[in-house]
């Protein structure tokens, strides 16, 4: 049996015969996007490209971003967040499984009132971490300064989009804070919890 991405039939408007396309391309046509892995430059660029293309194609139809991600790199995650704010269509964010670290940052970036978590989803927030533990002292100081700026940026976004006071978000980001779907709703990261 072949292994790979499943194919599904798709008929373009005005065509008689359907062609077989991979399931993700079919879902993209319905404006359904998926972040189902660690956030890195590759997936970030793919999602940014899709959001820009789909918003040019039709700026009146909303986009739906499904998230099941353990987090990942800060800059590619912030790039996804910024694109979500930039495109004209509203971007709904849907947490299924886990939205941790940058995954939760992207989740909170959905259009306010259009952020959803599945009932058994988990959300985790924390401060950004450095990957340069073995850097020279001078490099480490520069890295620490940049890390503090990024932490401040992420904290401000959480404060703005959750309505929580700055001191609460700052304190919570000091460590890994895991939340259930209903706890994430109470915190303001999502607006709705899907019913079972």
UniProtKB/Swiss-Prot annotation:
Subcellular location(s) of the protein: Plastid, Chloroplast stroma
SUPFAM superfamilies membership: ClpP/crotonase
Annotated EC: 3.4.21.92
GO MF term set: ATP-dependent peptidase activity; ATPase binding; serine-type endopeptidase activity
Uppermost EC category: hydrolase
Major location (coarse): plastid
Gene Ontology BP term (one): protein quality control for misfolded or incompletely synthesized proteins
Active-site residue list: 101, 126
Keywords, comma-separated and alphabetical: Chloroplast, Hydrolase, Plastid, Protease, Serine protease
A GO CC term assigned to this protein in UniProt: chloroplast stroma
Coiled-coil region: none
InterPro entries (alphabetical): ClpP, ClpP/crotonase-like_dom_sf, ClpP/TepA, ClpP_His_AS, ClpP_Ser_AS
Catalytic activity from the UniProt record: Hydrolysis of proteins to small peptides in the presence of ATP and magnesium. alpha-casein is the usual test substrate. In the absence of ATP, only oligopeptides shorter than five residues are hydrolyzed (such as succinyl-Leu-Tyr-|-NHMec, and Leu-Tyr-Leu-|-Tyr-Trp, in which cleavage of the -Tyr-|-Leu- and -Tyr-|-Trp bonds also occurs)
Annotated CDD domains: S14_ClpP_2
Function description: Cleaves peptides in various proteins in a process that requires ATP hydrolysis. Has a chymotrypsin-like activity. Plays a major role in the degradation of misfolded proteins.
Subunit-level organization: Component of the chloroplastic Clp protease core complex.
Family to which this protein belongs: Belongs to the peptidase S14 family.
Name of the protein in question: ATP-dependent Clp protease proteolytic subunit
């Amino acid at each position: 049996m072949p292994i790979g991405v499943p194919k599904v039939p798709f008929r373009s408007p005005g065509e008689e015969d359907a062609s077989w396309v991979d399931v993700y391309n079919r879902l993209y046509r319905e404006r359904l996007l998926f972040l189902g892995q660690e956030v890195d430059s590759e997936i970030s660029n793919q999602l940014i490209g899709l959001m820009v293309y789909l918003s040019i194609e039709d700026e009146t139809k909303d986009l739906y971003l499904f998230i099941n991600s353990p987090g990942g790199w800060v800059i590619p995650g912030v790039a996804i967040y910024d694109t979500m704010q930039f495109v004209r269509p509203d971007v709904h964010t849907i947490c299924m499984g886990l939205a941790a670290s940058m995954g939760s940052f992207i989740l909170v970036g959905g259009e306010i009132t259009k952020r959803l978590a599945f009932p058994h989803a988990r959300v985790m927030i924390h401060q950004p971490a450095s990957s340069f533990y073995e850097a020279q002292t001078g490099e480490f100081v520069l890295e620490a300064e940049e890390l503090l700026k990024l932490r401040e940026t992420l904290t401000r976004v959480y404060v703005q989009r959750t309505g929580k006071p700055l001191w609460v978000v700052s304190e919570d980001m000091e460590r890994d804070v895991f939340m259930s779907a209903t706890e994430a709703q109470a915190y303001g990261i999502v607006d709705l919890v899907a019913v079972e």
